[in-house]
Amino acid sequence: MDYQQLANQIKQWAIELGFEKVGICDVDLSEHEPALQAWLDAGYHGEMDWMARHGMMRARPAELLPGTLRVISARINYLPPQAQFASNLSDPNQAYISRYALGRDYHKLVRNQLKKLGEKIEQEVGKLGYRPFVDSAPILERPLAQKAGLGWTGKHSLILDKENGSWFFLGELLVDIPLPVDEPSENQCGKCTACITSCPTNAIVAEGVVDARRCVSYLTIEYSGVIPLEFRRAMGNRIYGCDDCQLVCPWNRFAPLTQQSDFHRRQSLNNADLVVLFEWDEATFLKNMEGSAIRRIGHQQWRRNLIIAMGNAPYSPRIIDTLQRHLGQSELLDEHIHWALEEQTQKTATPRQHARLIRIIEKGLPRDA
């Protein structure tokens, strides 16, 4: 069999299935094992125990599917039209949701596309051992993507491509056929440190190393406990994930919009008013978030994140009333509500003093000099 011709055909099939780019690499990730172990030993994975539980299996694809010879790494863009980054982040009364989560959950969509790709290959070669992976499986997808030529690992630890930035999902198809491999990508970050200096919680502790325990994405999505005080103000209005390190990256000026309508903003998130989203009861949350990656954090965590955002919002009697009405429903939520109410109350002093000063000036001075 002409494996080079097959590799070319696989890449064409992938494009037809909706992927933007596909690359092929071998399964040797041994050079990444020391860094992975050091990251785990430092506790940077936080409470994501499954990462430590799988250990070095993440760097050994052949242990996930015995007989694996190659990894087909695929990329699909998710940047939605009218992303409204600046207008959303600059309005503290509106919730900011990481742009990857505005539409449908990508896991099923990308996995299904990879499965179809595997089926096409099997039809061509006969019996084929293959298995698709998307994000949640214990596999080092970013080193694989770099090795397959899809981009390099940026200082924020995400994969970057000079023509497409970083607004894309990755998926892998493990196969047991000896396809020719692609050239790995070379790092193009240079001396730029925009992502490191712009992280609101200083979570990027070294080039390419993120302490998840400090990362807003981890805190709002993976962590279900009490948010440490030191991070609450820095979270701002970010209630699900954070895009700051991508927003400041110069390479993302070239990022194209997604061709997948499933990744467009869902209608239920058109009104991102903090109070409106917080007032959703659990049934409404589950209904509005059906098919969304957001759904898996659950209603309580959704509200916890919104409480912090309301604490960070400008002084608002509406917010104070909303928070007070929901006291006593949960110890976890109460912990954050008390903090948010204190934050809101502190904000009333300065505006009131300012208003008093203005009244005195208006009444006491013959003119506004």
From Swiss-Prot:
Its main location: cytoplasm. It is an enzyme of class 1 (oxidoreductase). Its cofactor is cob(II)alamin; [4Fe-4S] cluster. Binds 2 [4Fe-4S] clusters per monomer. Residues 177-209 form the 4Fe-4S ferredoxin-type domain. GO terms for biological process: queuosine biosynthetic process; tRNA modification. It catalyses: epoxyqueuosine(34) in tRNA + AH2 = queuosine(34) in tRNA + A + H2O. Pathway: tRNA modification; tRNA-queuosine biosynthesis. The gene is queG. [4Fe-4S] cluster 2 binds at residues 199, 215, 242, 245. It holds the Pfam family QueG_DUF1730. Its EC number is 1.17.99.6. The active site is at 135 (proton donor). [4Fe-4S] cluster 1 binds at residues 189, 192, 195, 249. It is found in: Cytoplasm. The keyword 4Fe-4S applies. Catalyzes the conversion of epoxyqueuosine (oQ) to queuosine (Q), which is a hypermodified base found in the wobble positions of tRNA(Asp), tRNA(Asn), tRNA(His) and tRNA(Tyr). This is Epoxyqueuosine reductase. The keyword Cytoplasm applies. Belongs to the QueG family. Monomer. It comes from Vibrio cholerae serotype O1 (strain ATCC 39315 / El Tor Inaba N16961).
